Amino acid sequence: IRVMDVKSIDEYKEYFYKTDHHWTIYGALAGYKDICDMLGIDEINNLNIVKHKNRLYYGSLAKTALNDNINDYISDVDIKLDYDVYVNGKSADSLFKPREIRLDRSYKYYDYYVQYFNGQYGNVVYDYHNNDKENLLIIGDSYSWQIDYLIANSFNKTHVINLRYDEYKNKDFN
């Protein structure tokens, strides 16, 4: 199994947030490219990376230490893809929010990562209506939130299951 090859401390700093355990969009895209290679699918090229500097981000590590000496900014790609999304079997129009930083939160350690990337759901389905393509099952966690919809672009329906939430929590999966 091929894994992401981080060649230097500078590359590591680019791939991962300073204040959070998650990867930045740069790390996520490196993982996305590796997954595309493994699955034999074409990656989406020329993705425009944006860093949302309208709100300081203090991730899980900063929150644990209650340390605000270092901050990050949420980073993402600026792309609009045409798909329908379902959360736990229901149309997600009211659940899945646009990828935007909430500016109405005053708590310094608010989890913008979860909010921005629509986390905390056990079953998300992306339907690209590519009926001539296969379906895909992703067993993922919070690291998949940044790229699952990009991977799903190469398939008809993609089911993203997070075993930590909802109906899968502490149960057998069959």
Regions found by a protein language model. Name each.
Residues 1-174:
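Extracellular glycan-modifying ectodomains
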